[in-house]
Amino acid sequence: GCPWEPWC
């Protein structure tokens, strides 16, 4: 997951 987009 991305730090700024939890759904990545």
From Swiss-Prot:
Disulphide connectivity of cysteines: C2-C8
UniProt key word NAD: no
MF (Gene Ontology): ion channel regulator activity; toxin activity
GO CC, alphabetical: extracellular region
D-tryptophan carried by residues: W4
PROSITE patterns xrefs: CONTRYPHAN (PS60027)
InterPro entries: Contryphan_CS
Name the record gives this protein: Contryphan-Le
Source organism phylogeny: Eukaryota, Metazoa, Spiralia, Lophotrochozoa, Mollusca
